[in-house]
């Protein structure tokens, strides 16, 4: 499958998305970055402990892809900037980068403490409480910051792994 040609021919992201078959623990793939950066975002259910990227690429042969980043399924739908932030925050090159064939695979999924060399404590995503978001929204004009903008906390809430700072 040549992603550059497929992206040019298919109008909707959903059509391109359906070209990939779930396999090796990968539940979904996003090709938003394939043409420009030769990168795939691969989404994995949190219950999946090990991802077999070789099986995924064996069943979904792609040309031109140089990098694949694994994310928790809950990150699906985040913007490119948000995924970049998540990848930088949730990966350690010494532990989370492998090469499968010609593709660099970065594991940016949330880390389970003590599993596969992960630290005993791992930080949770930081979000403001709903009450705090509502309070800031109600007083936004007082702060003189211009037009009201949506809090990113609402978008990131689905990434929480527990109600504590570390899990």
Where are these regions (language model features)?
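Charged, compositionally biased interaction regions
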Residues: 1-167
